[in-house]
């Protein structure tokens, strides 16, 4: 025991202990935030739908997403209309802030306008989501949580 007290009395030993604990603690905190991948929402395509199921050019439609809400985080949503067969983007809407108030009742509802120059036929709605759920994801955008919603198909009529 006296050897330990003598060792602790040496300044260089205390400095080495401090220099070992500090970087390890920082690495643990940064590692925890870097591996934080829990999505704010899980989207259930089989229970989701578009109202009305058939629309026309210029018409407003509402997508009703059945979701499981896990957490609330700031982020952005890039909504897209795509060809359900090829995945080609037919229309892209301006990025918008992610909804931080929705999903508590199990539903997210988003209204969009069908573009005037869109072709008739089946079209799929999807969103590219980007969330920053902690400070590291805000400062290092490559670590942000990114994912696509499932595609919900509806019909555009002339």
Model-derived features: where do they sit?
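N-terminal Lys/Arg-rich, disordered targeting/topogenic segments
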Residues: 1-10
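Hydrophobic membrane-insertion alpha-helices, especially the h-region
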Residues: 11-35
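Extracellular/lumen-exposed scaffold segments
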Residues: 18, 33, 44, 93-98, ...
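Contiguous segments within soluble domain cores/interaction surfaces
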Residues: 40-108, 135
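A glycine-anchored, Pro-Gly-centered beta-turn/N-cap motif
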Residues: 104-106, 119-125
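Short, surface-exposed loop/turn segments at beta-strand-coil junctions that are enriched for proline
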Residues: 111-120, 132
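Short beta-strand elements
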Residues: 133-158
């Amino acid at each position: 025991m006296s050897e330990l007290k003598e060792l602790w009395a040496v300044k260089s030993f205390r400095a080495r202990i401090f220099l070992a604990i500090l970087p390890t603690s920082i690495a643990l905190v940064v590692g925890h935030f870097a591996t934080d991948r829990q999505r704010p929402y899980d989207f259930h395509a089989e229970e989701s739908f578009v109202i009305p199921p058939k629309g026309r050019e210029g018409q407003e439609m509402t997508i009703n997403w059945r979701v499981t809400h896990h957490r609330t985080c700031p982020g952005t949503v890039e909504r897209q209309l795509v060809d359900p067969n090829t995945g080609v983007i037919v229309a892209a809407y301006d990025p918008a802030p992610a909804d931080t108030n929705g999903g508590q009742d199990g539903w997210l509802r988003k209204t969009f306008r069908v573009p005037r120059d869109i072709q008739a036929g089946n079209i799929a709605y999807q969103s590219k989501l980007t969330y920053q759920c902690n400070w590291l994801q805000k400062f290092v955008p490559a670590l942000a949580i990114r994912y696509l919603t499932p595609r919900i198909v509806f019909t555009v009529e002339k």
